[in-house]
């Protein structure tokens, strides 16, 4: 592509010579396009891009989508472009995560698409493993486990095991049961066949300013995939100590609500037309149960001044779902059902009681985790204390 054409599309012109050994044919299809959305992450960006450059699967393109960063992130990206011809940059004004990812999908040329968040870093053989499994099983999605990673106060990591060995290394249809939908979306621990994404029109919701927009993408991909494979390997290190991870801006409070509104719209329209109304209704009930988990996770991340208003919106949505019979309280486990019933009755009172538990010593914190995440989260809390005492 001529340099002027790259400039018109807001993309930095790629360098033809890089550290991976000579001339890179800009017209040959790469095996995989790795999308790296970037916004003001200079502190972690080099570790992220180093892990991309070091992949044992070398025939890849690394598309860095700079979402109007005001720090040194663009300069860091250019450093990598000068050293390695596989790096390109989409340089644009700030428009949010979803729009950035859609721009990356539009630019991608690979047979497969992978995603790497700019504060995380991949295992060196991650992409090679994922693509090998995808080709071996003719899979549309291959997804692995990942490590939770802390760099301070001392470096440590813990395996986040979504897929036990008994679920791995076999072809599944994710929509056949609810299991896959209830796992953390983690779009970045997977690869997707690009023609599968294009055929299903699986894209991101381009909400301006939103930071976390993976729920609708994941749900659509799982709903449409006929062939998916889970692997037990840890694919990357998912950073837990990024100070910018909580929601402190009022315009981002309801981004997760927008994601689930899009899923509900899509199920009732495109998916129902494609797969039938009965199948769409079945997945709609799964969606509501998954939405509860996602909303409770989002609640914890909100700044305190936004929590009651978020719960009020949550209560309104679930009341509407109960009224139109797209959801039944029986779809939730008993402790989740009791929790939601309290929120539906009085969101502000639930929030006040929850904050009391959270600040009431060891027992109060235990009750706080039990209310938010049930026995599983309580056990995880207890384990984390025993590991560090």
Regions from the PLM with identified roles:
Residues 4-53:
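N-proximal low-complexity "stem/linker" segments adjacent to membrane-targeting elements
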Residues 19-21, 139, 163, 300-389:
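Membrane-interface aromatic/basic loop that binds lipid-linked glycans or pyrophosphate carriers
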Residues 30-33, 61, 216:
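Cell-envelope/extracellular polymer assembly enzymes that use nucleotide-activated donors
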Residues 66-75, 95, 117:
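A conserved acidic beta->alpha catalytic loop
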Residues 74-109:
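Conserved donor nucleotide-binding strand/loop of the catalytic core
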Residues 97, 101, 118-232, 236-253:
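Donor-binding/catalytic cores of nucleotide-activated saccharide
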Residues 113:
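Short aromatic/hydrophobic "clamp" motif used to bind/position activated sugar donors
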Residues 233-242, 247-274, 292-325:
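Catalytic core of nucleotide-sugar-dependent glycosyltransferases
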């Amino acid at each position: 592509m001529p340099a002027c054409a790259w400039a018109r599309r807001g993309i930095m012109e790629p360098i033809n010579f890089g550290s991976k050994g000579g001339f890179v044919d800009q017209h040959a299809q790469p095996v995989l396009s790795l999308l790296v959305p970037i916004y003001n992450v200079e502190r972690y960006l080099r570790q992220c891009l180093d892990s991309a450059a070091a992949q044992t699967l070398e025939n890849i393109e690394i598309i860095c989508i700079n979402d109007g960063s005001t720090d040194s992130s663009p300069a860091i990206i250019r450093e990598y472009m000068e050293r390695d011809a596989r790096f390109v940059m989409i340089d644009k004004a700030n428009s949010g995560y979803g729009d950035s990812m859609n721009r990356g999908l539009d630019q991608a040329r690979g047979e497969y698409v992978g995603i790497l968040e700019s504060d995380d870093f991949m295992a060196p053989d991650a992409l090679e493993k994922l693509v090998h499994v995808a080709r071996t099983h003719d899979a549309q999605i291959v997804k692995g486990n990942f490590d939770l990673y802390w760099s301070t106060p001392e470096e440590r990591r813990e395996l986040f095991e979504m897929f036990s060995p008994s679920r791995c290394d076999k072809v599944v249809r994710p929509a056949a049961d609810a299991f896959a939908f209830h796992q953390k979306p983690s779009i970045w621990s997977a690869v997707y066949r690009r023609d599968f994404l294009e055929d299903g029109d699986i894209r991101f919701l381009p909400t301006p300013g939103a930071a976390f927009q993976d729920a609708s993408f994941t749900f659509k991909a799982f709903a449409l995939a006929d062939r998916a494979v889970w692997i037990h390997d840890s694919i990357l290190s998912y950073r837990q100590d990024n100070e910018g991870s909580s929601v402190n801006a009022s315009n981002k409070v309801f981004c997760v609500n927008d994601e689930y509104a899009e899923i509900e719209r899509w199920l009732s329209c495109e998916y129902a037309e494609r797969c039938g109304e009965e199948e769409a209704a079945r997945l709609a009930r799964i969606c509501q149960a998954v939405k509860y988990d996602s909303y409770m996770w989002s609640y914890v991340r909100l700044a305190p001044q936004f929590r009651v208003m978020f719960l009020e919106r949550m209560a309104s949505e679930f009341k509407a779902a109960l009224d139109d019979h797209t959801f039944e309280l029986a779809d939730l486990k008993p402790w989740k059902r009791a929790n939601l019933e309290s929120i539906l009755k009085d969101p502000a009172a639930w929030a006040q009681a929850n904050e009391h538990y959270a600040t009431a010593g060891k027992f109060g914190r235990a009750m706080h985790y039990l209310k938010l995440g049930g026995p599983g989260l309580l056990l995880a809390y207890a384990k984390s204390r025993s590991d560090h005492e």
